[in-house]
UniProtKB/Swiss-Prot annotation:
Protein name (Swiss-Prot/TrEMBL): Protein disulfide-isomerase A6
UniProt cross-references to NCBIfam families, sorted A to Z: pdi_dom (TIGR01126)
BP GO terms, sorted: IRE1-mediated unfolded protein response; negative regulation of IRE1-mediated unfolded protein response; platelet activation; platelet aggregation; protein folding; response to endoplasmic reticulum stress
Gene Ontology CC: endoplasmic reticulum; endoplasmic reticulum chaperone complex; endoplasmic reticulum lumen; endoplasmic reticulum-Golgi intermediate compartment; extracellular space; melanosome; plasma membrane; smooth endoplasmic reticulum
Localization in the cell: Endoplasmic reticulum lumen; Cell membrane; Melanosome
Organism field: Rattus norvegicus (Rat)
Gene3D superfamilies: Glutaredoxin
Database matches in Pfam families: Thioredox_PDIA6_C (PF24541), Thioredoxin (PF00085)
Site (Contributes to redox potential value) residue list: G56, H57, G191, H192
Residues the record marks as site: Lowers pKa of C-terminal Cys of first active site: R118
Gene it is expressed from: Pdia6
Length: 440
């Protein structure tokens, strides 16, 4: 009965915090499916809050944000992104904490961070100030946009994430590089190129973050850099080509949306990337860094070395390495430890009750984990990871609500374990009569 009441309370709490905004508010709910259309392609000034429903600061900001949206209605657009649900949008704009507020002005691909007060009045003042600046820029002929003609591409945030290439810089940057390059050949007057620009810029940012710069997106003005256009037979715009070290360039014939481009880039990355490292948990830095820098970290707790020997342990590690390679496109972190070596970690993840080996996958951002309940085999682990990759499977909060303490220890030396040597006790001076008296 207590569990039922607790479950109802939890559900009520979840519904409350997940509904910070509704369709009846003047705050426009933004998602990956409408963000580009509503914000990036809009001529309006936008204030966008990136929030998480469980965030206390976000909950306190909500009434003030609604108040500002009502006051600015038909003057400035006010939106909100559930960045906990739509992590791709948050990642695209470098959101690392909640709430984060960004102002999308003339240059939609280079929003400014809002650092003002959290009251409705302060938000409105900042919006009107940004609006005045936008109007002044337009009067002065400075659109600041990514698509502002022949020079517009180089003046936007794409200058950082979309690499502008020329006849002089192409070979050094692309052909001499170990990285994978996706290069768009465009003409400034081309309508299809203009439509592609925001998608290409958004994809460049996401790909850069997800591949750690190993896949790069670039652009070449083919009307200016005619040597390159001739070399690669560019006859229509836009033309996108993929360049990989030691291979002939191939045409990209996929979709023109951000998600299509990112998906292809990640495929290229996984095809060329080495398998992720499988690290032993020997200190807190390794454990926390691996989990905090990846969407998920997979933690395996293997039997004690005395139970398996080096051969048995290595067979487990081989299975883990094989699966790490199979799922490398996910860019998860991979960790392992020995049973009993990290008691607090095991306790926080509820590991040990089913015996060893055991496995859990941790989302350090949400402090939740999923536990492998099937067999610790290649097939069993693969089914577990496949469910996780589709966002399925049951999860639970990490015990204690924070990352558990890690006990420093020496790394495994790759050898069989040895039983501790018992000290020989000299009993020659001990009289048996005395022992009998002690026992009594």
């Amino acid at each position: 009965m207590a569990r039922l009441v607790l479950g109802l309370v939890s559900c009520t709490f979840f519904l409350a915090v997940s509904a910070l905004y509704s369709s009846s508010d003047d705050v426009i709910e933004l998602t990956p499916s409408n963000f580009n259309r509503e914000v990036i392609q809009s001529d309006s000034l936008w204030l966008v809050e990136f929030y998480a429903p469980w965030c206390g600061h976000c909950q306190r900001l909500t009434p003030e944000w609604k108040k500002a949206a009502s006051a600015l209605k038909d003057v400035v657009k006010v939106g909100a992104v559930n960045a906990d649900k739509h992590q791709s949008l948050g990642g695209q704009y470098g959101v690392q904490g909640f709430p984060t507020i960004k102002i999308f002005g003339a240059n939609k691909n280079k929003p400014e961070d809002y650092q003002g007060g959290r009251t409705g009045e302060a938000i409105v003042d900042a919006a009107l100030s940004a609006l005045r600046q936008l109007v002044k820029d337009r009067l002065g002929g400075r659109s600041g946009g990514y698509s502002s003609g022949k020079q517009g591409r180089g003046d936007s945030s794409s200058k950082k994430d979309v690499v502008e290439l020329t006849d002089d810089t192409f070979d050094k940057n692309v052909l001499d590089s170990e990285d994978v390059w996706m290069v768009e050949f465009y003409a400034p007057w081309c309508g299809h190129c203009k439509n592609l620009e925001p998608e290409w810029a958004a994809a460049a940012t996401e790909v850069k973050e997800q591949t750690k710069g190993k896949v790069k997106l670039a652009a070449v003005d083919a009307t200016v850099n005619q040597v390159l256009a001739s070399r690669y037979g560019i006859k229509g715009f836009p033309t996108i080509k993929i360049f990989q070290k030691g291979e002939s360039p191939v045409d990209y014939d996929g979709g023109r949306t951000r998600s299509d481009i990112v998906s292809r880039a990640l495929d290229l990355f996984s095809d060329n990337a080495p398998p992720p490292e499988l690290l032993e948990i020997i200190n807190e830095d390794i454990a926390k860094k691996t989990c905090e820098e990846h969407q998920l970290c997979v933690v395996a707790v293997l039997p004690h070395i005395l139970d398996t020997g080096a051969t048995g342990r290595n067979s487990y590690l081989e299975v883990l390495l094989k699966l790490a390679d199979k799922y490398k496109k996910k860019m998860w972190g991979w960790l392992w430890t020995e049973a009993g070596a990290q008691y607090e970690l095991e306790n926080a993840l509820g590991i040990g009750g089913f015996g060893y080996p055991a496995m859990a996958a941790i989302n350090a951002r949400k402090m939740k984990f999923a536990l492998l309940k099937g067999s610790f085999s290649e097939q069993g682990i693969n089914e577990f990871l496949r469910e996780l990759s589709f966002g399925r499977g049951s999860t639970a909060p990490v015990g204690g609500g924070s990352f558990p303490n890690i006990t420093p220890r020496e790394p495994w030396d790759g050898k069989d374990g040895e039983l501790p040597v018992e000290d020989d006790i000299d009993l020659s001076d001990v009289e048996l009569d005395d022992l009998e008296k002690d026992e009594l």
